[in-house]
Amino acid sequence: MSDPVLYGLARSVYTRIARLALEEKGVRYTLEEVEIFGSAGVPAEHLARQPFGRIPAFAHEGFTLYETDAITRYIDEAFPGTRLQPQELRARARMNQVIAIIDSYAYRPMIWGVFAARIVAPEEGIASNEMLVAESLTRSRTCCRALEEILGTNCYFAGAEVTLADLHALPILLYFSMTQEGHETLSAHPRLRAWLDAAAARPSVQRTRAKFELAR
Protein backbone atom coordinates (compact mmCIF):
# COMPACT_ATOMS: atom_id res chain seq x y z
CA MET A 1 0.00 0.00 0.00
CA SER A 2 1.44 3.35 -1.02
CA ASP A 3 1.57 6.26 1.39
CA PRO A 4 -1.12 8.92 0.98
CA VAL A 5 -0.18 12.41 -0.19
CA LEU A 6 -1.58 15.54 1.40
CA TYR A 7 -1.39 18.72 -0.67
CA GLY A 8 -1.37 21.90 1.38
CA LEU A 9 0.69 24.19 3.57
CA ALA A 10 2.16 23.35 6.94
CA ARG A 11 1.03 26.74 8.27
CA SER A 12 -2.58 26.23 7.10
CA VAL A 13 -5.03 25.31 9.85
CA TYR A 14 -7.08 23.09 7.55
CA THR A 15 -4.01 21.28 6.26
CA ARG A 16 -3.05 20.72 9.87
CA ILE A 17 -6.45 19.26 10.72
CA ALA A 18 -5.88 16.56 8.09
CA ARG A 19 -2.30 16.04 9.29
CA LEU A 20 -3.52 15.59 12.86
CA ALA A 21 -5.87 12.83 11.72
CA LEU A 22 -3.02 11.09 9.91
CA GLU A 23 -0.73 11.47 12.91
CA GLU A 24 -3.32 10.22 15.40
CA LYS A 25 -3.92 7.16 13.22
CA GLY A 26 -0.19 6.54 12.86
CA VAL A 27 -0.33 6.77 9.06
CA ARG A 28 2.82 7.47 7.08
CA TYR A 29 2.18 10.23 4.57
CA THR A 30 3.83 12.85 2.40
CA LEU A 31 3.00 16.53 2.77
CA GLU A 32 3.45 18.25 -0.59
CA GLU A 33 3.52 21.99 -0.06
CA VAL A 34 1.27 23.98 -2.40
CA GLU A 35 1.50 27.77 -2.14
CA ILE A 36 -1.91 29.20 -2.96
CA PHE A 37 -1.41 32.65 -1.41
CA GLY A 38 1.52 33.82 -3.55
CA SER A 39 1.45 36.55 -6.19
CA ALA A 40 1.27 33.91 -8.94
CA GLY A 41 -2.04 32.64 -7.57
CA VAL A 42 -3.11 29.04 -7.29
CA PRO A 43 -0.87 26.68 -9.32
CA ALA A 44 -2.60 25.13 -12.33
CA GLU A 45 -1.71 21.62 -11.22
CA HIS A 46 -3.47 22.22 -7.92
CA LEU A 47 -6.60 23.53 -9.63
CA ALA A 48 -6.67 20.25 -11.52
CA ARG A 49 -7.04 18.39 -8.22
CA GLN A 50 -9.04 21.08 -6.35
CA PRO A 51 -11.12 23.24 -8.72
CA PHE A 52 -11.87 25.81 -6.01
CA GLY A 53 -8.18 26.41 -5.32
CA ARG A 54 -8.36 25.60 -1.60
CA ILE A 55 -6.20 23.41 0.58
CA PRO A 56 -5.83 20.65 1.54
CA ALA A 57 -6.34 18.05 -1.15
CA PHE A 58 -5.59 14.37 -0.68
CA ALA A 59 -4.57 11.39 -2.79
CA HIS A 60 -4.38 7.72 -1.85
CA GLU A 61 -3.76 4.90 -4.31
CA GLY A 62 -5.37 6.71 -7.22
CA PHE A 63 -8.26 8.08 -5.17
CA THR A 64 -8.33 11.87 -4.86
CA LEU A 65 -10.36 13.91 -2.43
CA TYR A 66 -10.80 17.46 -1.21
CA GLU A 67 -12.73 19.15 1.63
CA THR A 68 -11.12 18.66 5.02
CA ASP A 69 -14.08 16.98 6.72
CA ALA A 70 -14.30 14.40 3.93
CA ILE A 71 -10.55 13.82 4.08
CA THR A 72 -10.42 13.24 7.84
CA ARG A 73 -13.36 10.85 7.79
CA TYR A 74 -11.74 8.91 4.96
CA ILE A 75 -8.48 8.74 6.93
CA ASP A 76 -10.28 7.43 9.99
CA GLU A 77 -12.17 4.77 8.05
CA ALA A 78 -9.48 3.73 5.56
CA PHE A 79 -6.65 3.08 8.01
CA PRO A 80 -6.30 0.97 11.15
CA GLY A 81 -5.62 2.52 14.51
CA THR A 82 -7.50 4.49 17.11
CA ARG A 83 -11.06 5.33 16.08
CA LEU A 84 -11.60 9.06 15.68
CA GLN A 85 -15.38 8.92 15.21
CA PRO A 86 -17.69 7.79 18.02
CA GLN A 87 -19.98 4.85 17.39
CA GLU A 88 -22.60 6.06 19.86
CA LEU A 89 -25.27 8.16 18.15
CA ARG A 90 -25.29 11.22 20.38
CA ALA A 91 -21.54 11.40 20.74
CA ARG A 92 -21.21 11.27 16.96
CA ALA A 93 -23.85 13.99 16.60
CA ARG A 94 -21.91 16.14 19.08
CA MET A 95 -18.73 15.63 17.08
CA ASN A 96 -20.51 16.71 13.91
CA GLN A 97 -21.95 19.75 15.69
CA VAL A 98 -18.54 20.98 16.83
CA ILE A 99 -17.03 20.53 13.37
CA ALA A 100 -19.88 22.57 11.90
CA ILE A 101 -19.45 25.32 14.52
CA ILE A 102 -15.75 25.61 13.73
CA ASP A 103 -16.32 25.78 9.97
CA SER A 104 -19.35 28.07 10.06
CA TYR A 105 -18.67 30.42 12.96
CA ALA A 106 -15.12 30.15 14.34
CA TYR A 107 -12.66 29.86 11.48
CA ARG A 108 -13.18 33.17 9.70
CA PRO A 109 -13.33 35.51 12.73
CA MET A 110 -10.61 33.75 14.71
CA ILE A 111 -8.15 33.26 11.87
CA TRP A 112 -8.84 35.95 9.26
CA GLY A 113 -10.29 38.48 11.68
CA VAL A 114 -7.97 38.24 14.71
CA PHE A 115 -4.96 36.00 14.06
CA ALA A 116 -4.18 37.48 10.64
CA ALA A 117 -4.46 41.02 12.01
CA ARG A 118 -2.33 40.45 15.08
CA ILE A 119 0.26 37.89 13.93
CA VAL A 120 0.46 37.85 10.13
CA ALA A 121 -0.15 41.52 9.27
CA PRO A 122 2.69 42.90 11.45
CA GLU A 123 5.16 40.46 9.86
CA GLU A 124 4.13 41.74 6.43
CA GLY A 125 4.02 45.41 7.41
CA ILE A 126 0.28 45.66 6.86
CA ALA A 127 -1.98 47.83 9.01
CA SER A 128 -4.76 46.02 10.85
CA ASN A 129 -8.42 46.76 10.27
CA GLU A 130 -9.46 47.43 13.87
CA MET A 131 -13.16 47.51 13.05
CA LEU A 132 -12.84 44.01 11.59
CA VAL A 133 -10.86 42.86 14.63
CA ALA A 134 -13.53 44.16 17.02
CA GLU A 135 -16.34 42.52 15.06
CA SER A 136 -14.39 39.27 14.82
CA LEU A 137 -13.72 39.25 18.56
CA THR A 138 -17.41 39.51 19.29
CA ARG A 139 -18.10 36.52 17.07
CA SER A 140 -15.11 34.61 18.47
CA ARG A 141 -16.30 35.10 22.04
CA THR A 142 -19.69 33.70 21.11
CA CYS A 143 -17.95 30.64 19.67
CA CYS A 144 -15.87 30.15 22.81
CA ARG A 145 -18.96 30.33 25.03
CA ALA A 146 -20.74 27.78 22.86
CA LEU A 147 -17.76 25.42 22.74
CA GLU A 148 -17.23 25.57 26.50
CA GLU A 149 -20.90 24.79 27.07
CA ILE A 150 -20.65 21.78 24.76
CA LEU A 151 -17.44 20.63 26.42
CA GLY A 152 -19.03 20.69 29.87
CA THR A 153 -17.05 18.50 32.24
CA ASN A 154 -15.82 16.15 29.51
CA CYS A 155 -12.16 15.79 28.60
CA TYR A 156 -12.99 16.16 24.91
CA PHE A 157 -15.89 17.53 22.91
CA ALA A 158 -17.62 14.20 22.28
CA GLY A 159 -16.76 12.54 25.58
CA ALA A 160 -13.74 10.86 27.12
CA GLU A 161 -11.78 10.25 23.92
CA VAL A 162 -10.28 12.41 21.18
CA THR A 163 -12.42 12.61 18.06
CA LEU A 164 -12.36 14.48 14.78
CA ALA A 165 -14.13 17.34 16.58
CA ASP A 166 -11.06 18.00 18.74
CA LEU A 167 -8.71 17.74 15.78
CA HIS A 168 -10.90 20.14 13.81
CA ALA A 169 -11.09 22.74 16.56
CA LEU A 170 -7.53 22.64 17.83
CA PRO A 171 -5.56 24.39 15.04
CA ILE A 172 -8.03 27.28 14.89
CA LEU A 173 -8.19 27.81 18.65
CA LEU A 174 -4.43 27.38 18.98
CA TYR A 175 -3.73 30.20 16.50
CA PHE A 176 -6.42 32.34 18.13
CA SER A 177 -4.80 31.81 21.54
CA MET A 178 -1.50 33.22 20.23
CA THR A 179 -3.03 36.71 20.09
CA GLN A 180 -3.49 38.84 23.19
CA GLU A 181 -7.24 39.06 22.63
CA GLY A 182 -7.49 35.34 22.03
CA HIS A 183 -5.50 34.57 25.16
CA GLU A 184 -7.77 36.83 27.21
CA THR A 185 -10.91 35.34 25.69
CA LEU A 186 -9.81 31.78 26.42
CA SER A 187 -8.74 32.72 29.94
CA ALA A 188 -12.35 33.74 30.54
CA HIS A 189 -13.42 30.19 29.59
CA PRO A 190 -11.28 27.99 31.87
CA ARG A 191 -12.67 24.62 30.79
CA LEU A 192 -12.07 25.42 27.14
CA ARG A 193 -8.60 26.73 28.00
CA ALA A 194 -7.81 23.51 29.89
CA TRP A 195 -8.99 21.45 26.91
CA LEU A 196 -6.76 23.46 24.57
CA ASP A 197 -3.70 23.11 26.80
CA ALA A 198 -4.17 19.35 27.15
CA ALA A 199 -4.86 18.82 23.44
CA ALA A 200 -1.90 20.98 22.41
CA ALA A 201 0.43 18.71 24.38
CA ARG A 202 -0.46 15.65 22.32
CA PRO A 203 2.43 14.22 20.24
CA SER A 204 0.44 14.67 17.02
CA VAL A 205 0.18 18.39 17.70
CA GLN A 206 3.84 18.74 18.60
CA ARG A 207 4.87 16.96 15.40
CA THR A 208 2.81 19.33 13.25
CA ARG A 209 3.85 22.66 14.74
CA ALA A 210 3.94 25.44 12.16
CA LYS A 211 6.26 28.40 11.74
CA PHE A 212 4.10 30.75 13.81
CA GLU A 213 4.41 28.46 16.85
CA LEU A 214 8.08 27.66 16.30
CA ALA A 215 8.90 31.37 16.27
CA ARG A 216 7.49 31.79 19.79
Role assignments for model-derived ranges:
Residues T208-R216:
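Terminal-tail/helix-coil boundary detector
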Residues A48, A201, A210:
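Phosphate-coordinating loops and pocket residues in cytosolic domains that bind phosphorylated ligands
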Residues M1-A134, C155:
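GST-like domain detector, emphasizing the conserved glutathione-binding G-site
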Residues A70, R90, R191, S204, ...:
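Residue-level recognition of oxygen-bearing side chains
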Residues A18, D76, I172-L173, R209:
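Active-site-flanking alpha-helical
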